[in-house]
A protein has these predicted regions:
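A Zn2+-metalloprotease active-site environment signal
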Residues: 6-19, 27-233
């Protein structure tokens, strides 16, 4: 995936990396959401998402070298993720203006290490990326992308971009009133019925991620290259 017009704006970015917090429980259903989204996109069976942090190293020299390498990789992932996030906001700003005659309200992009808290509760790396409707923020531990590439066999920029675009898709659902409507229906639905609607909510977020990819190309934000689709399947 090639950037034609990249947006590195950080006005809607919150960096919590390296800021330790008490490890909290993952938001209910978040793991299932990510597993479903990745399954639909890659065709792989992701039955669990595990902690992606690796163990310690044996010497101080090795530790310094590895830490420097990881820090550089982490920063590159931050830049890439922020560009995808900003491009998704640019796309939905255009769509809301042209099709809905509404002003698009941008969410906030939060990167964290190991664990964090949100208005939806606590979460850790094992939760995977998630969107919290209560504070309108997208959360991600960037180490997730290493797991996406190695354990889940979904390498490539497009696979990583899809994950972020999917979470922004949940923000779009919030703005359109879809999320609130489902919450209002919850008390009237059985658990089985509610789960069916939850799956549909995920499918729609997948569809919105596809809209991002399509519009981002039309708006000359990105250009898909040979192998991009294959790398995510």
């Amino acid at each position: 995936m090639k950037w034609i017009n990249s947006n590195d704006d950080q006005s809607n970015y919150e960096d919590r990396r390296g800021k330790g917090v008490k490890r909290g429980a993952a938001i209910g259903g978040v793991g299932t959401i990510i597993v479903l989204a990745l399954y639909l996109f890659t065709g792989q069976d992701f039955s669990s998402v595990v902690n992606v942090l690796s163990g310690g190293v044996t010497t101080q020299t090795q530790e310094t070298s590895v830490d420097d390498s990881r820090a550089k990789e982490n920063e590159e992932l931050k830049v890439f993720s922020l560009r995808v996030f900003n491009s998704a906001n640019d796309v939905w700003t255009e769509i809301f203006n042209e099709q809905f005659q509404q002003k698009y309200r941008k969410p906030t992009f939060v990167t964290f290490t190991d664990a964090t808290t949100s208005e939806c509760g606590g979460a850790n790396s094992a939760s995977g990326p998630f969107y919290c409707p209560a504070d309108e923020k997208v959360y991600i531990d960037l180490a997730f992308f290493n797991e996406l590439s190695t354990r889940f066999r979904a390498p490539g920029d497009l696979a990583m971009a899809y994950v972020i675009a999917h979470e922004v898709g949940h923000h779009v659902q919030k703005l359109l009133g879809i999320t609130d409507k489902l919450d209002q229906m919850r008390s009237r639905l059985s658990e089985e019925e509610y789960n069916k609607y939850s799956v549909k909510l995920e499918l729609q977020a997948d569809f919105f991620a596809g809209i991002w990819a399509n519009y981002a190309q039309k708006l000359n934000i990105i250009q898909l290259e040979n192998g991009d689709i294959e790398s995510g399947t």
